[in-house]
Design a protein with these regions (language model features):
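Alpha-helical transmembrane segments and their immediate juxtamembrane cytosolic regions
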Residues: 1-242
Length: 242
């Protein structure tokens, strides 16, 4: 954070390119993006051992040890953090000069998305590995959304509907914790030989909404449940902070 702002872009580029090189060099030849043979899993197995890793992924009928966003993925995660820091600096500077941040963020966001989609051909977008192309894609989308929201809320001073997002934003730690608790408990709870989450999808959401829309409906419902808990805290003025 003490680094001059003008160097952050180069630091970000260095981190993302280095992660790409590490993944390619230390993953198994031809399988460096495979769930069983990637460098992220290899390092986690070396550092923590198989018994201390998450066993939520099934390969050939067997649950394997693999932590999504493992220790090595901290590198690109730092880059994600730096992108957020860069946006905050940009918004601050634009506010001081009384300028709109919309066009700048739309331009940068679009550029990052284009780079991500091109890079995806060589280093695929993958959330579980937090790949460099995934970082750029998410940053690009976020830049555009932040630009639009900043323009709508700060420049146009439109506040209708903001409370819905404030409920989650002011208690983001609680929202994350609730989502993890629900996901873990649904995964443990068995109904007719299926996990609770699988049963809900296949018996409620998929029959009503179809395959893809059912998945979307499940995700939206999950978010709304978490929002409901956060809303209770919002009404009580209870906020969890670090």
């Amino acid at each position: 954070l003490q680094t001059p702002a003008k160097w952050l872009t180069w630091i970000n580029a260095g981190i993302l390119l280095s992660f790409w090189g590490i993944m390619y060099a230390f993953g198994d030849a031809g399988l460096w993006m495979d769930i069983s043979h990637n460098a992220v899993r290899k390092l986690d197995l070396f550092l923590f051992g198989e018994s201390h890793l998450y066993h939520g992924n099934v390969v050939n009928g067997v649950r394997i040890a693999f932590d999504p966003e493992g220790f090595l993925s901290t590198l690109p995660a730092i880059s994600t953090c730096l992108f957020g820091y860069q946006v905050s600096l940009y918004l601050e500077n634009q506010a001081k000069e009384n300028k709109s941040a919309l066009l700048g963020l739309l331009g940068w966001g679009s550029t990052l998305i284009i780079i991500a989609l091109i890079w995806d051909q060589a280093f695929p977008v993958n959330k579980k590995l937090w790949t460099s192309s995934f970082v750029l894609l998410c940053a690009g989308i976020d830049f555009i959304l932040i630009g639009l929201l900043n323009w709508w809320i700060e420049t146009k001073e439109r506040h209708f509907g903001n409370t819905f997002f404030l409920v989650l934003g002011t208690n983001s730690i609680l929202a994350y914790g609730i989502s993890e608790i629900i996901a873990i408990q649904l995964g443990k709870y068995q109904i007719q030989g299926q996990s609770g989450s699988d049963w809900l999808y296949w018996h409620i959401f998929e029959p009503i909404f179809g395959k893809y829309n059912g998945s979307l409906a499940y995700a939206i419902t999950f978010v709304l449940v978490c929002w409901g808990v956060c809303w209770v805290f919002w009404r009580k003025k209870w906020f969890l902070k670090v």
